[in-house]
């Protein structure tokens, strides 16, 4: 997928780039698969900001995606590739012989006219097919991986992402995550074959503040530009550096400090991600 750039007619256009949308074939979305999501803008039920630098953004409707892929042994046909405002990957509209319509994440290489199928048993290894991890050959790249059987895919769902099946041990399959983390996942969990499409999304340059405002991202103020009452880095005459290690507004060390709490599932992690 090509990246489209612009001539610098204005300063904001100079570094801005967008994805070419020639791969999008749909003129409109399926009404029955659209729903509204309440925009919280980073506020909780008391109206207080719990996540900074967020706002409403442009109005959009949520597309209901079939992450479970639980329509087994029925072949569906891809009739459209669509844009989804809630994710950076494209979505594919699949129509089944009984008239059922579902959206799935579009893997790289899946196009209009292709057939997809999901099954609890074994299938051919083709892009867009979904099956249980125990039936997928070692070395295959997969996406939309479940963490609990029947819960729906939760891993490797964004544009260009994929995980690789590295081996099996008892009732578990060993997966190498996009972060290079190695972990066990129950072999009864479902996964889809292939790499999530729209891989060039990572190369897009936002270029101007207005595009981020449309995405619901507000400006972020540096702590060193604040007063001491507002941030540990605040205060001082002129551009004063921080004393000690950088911290968050609440004093938690920044830049690599581990804040993840221990979980029962830690025993399923074989090795952590490798830092570049």
Swiss-Prot record:
Record flagged with keyword Ribosomal protein: yes
SUPFAM superfamilies, per the entry: Nucleic acid-binding proteins, Translation proteins SH3-like domain
Keywords: Ribonucleoprotein, Ribosomal protein, RNA-binding, rRNA-binding
Compositional bias of kind Basic residues: 257-276
GO cellular component, one term: large ribosomal subunit
Chain positions covered by the region annotation Disordered: 212-276
GO biological process: cytoplasmic translation
Pfam families noted in UniProt: Ribosomal_L2, Ribosomal_L2_C
Listed InterPro entries: NA-bd_OB-fold, Rib_uL2_dom2, Ribosomal_uL2, Ribosomal_uL2_bac/org-type, Ribosomal_uL2_C, Ribosomal_uL2_CS, Ribosomal_uL2_dom3, Ribosomal_uL2_RNA-bd_dom
GO MF entries: rRNA binding; structural constituent of ribosome; transferase activity
Family: Belongs to the universal ribosomal protein uL2 family.
Job description of the protein: One of the primary rRNA binding proteins. Required for association of the 30S and 50S subunits to form the 70S ribosome, for tRNA binding and peptide bond formation. It has been suggested to have peptidyltransferase activity; this is somewhat controversial. Makes several contacts with the 16S rRNA in the 70S ribosome.
Subunit record text: Part of the 50S ribosomal subunit. Forms a bridge to the 30S subunit in the 70S ribosome.
Name of the protein: Large ribosomal subunit protein uL2
Native source organism of the sequence: Helicobacter acinonychis (strain Sheeba)
This protein's encoding gene: rplB
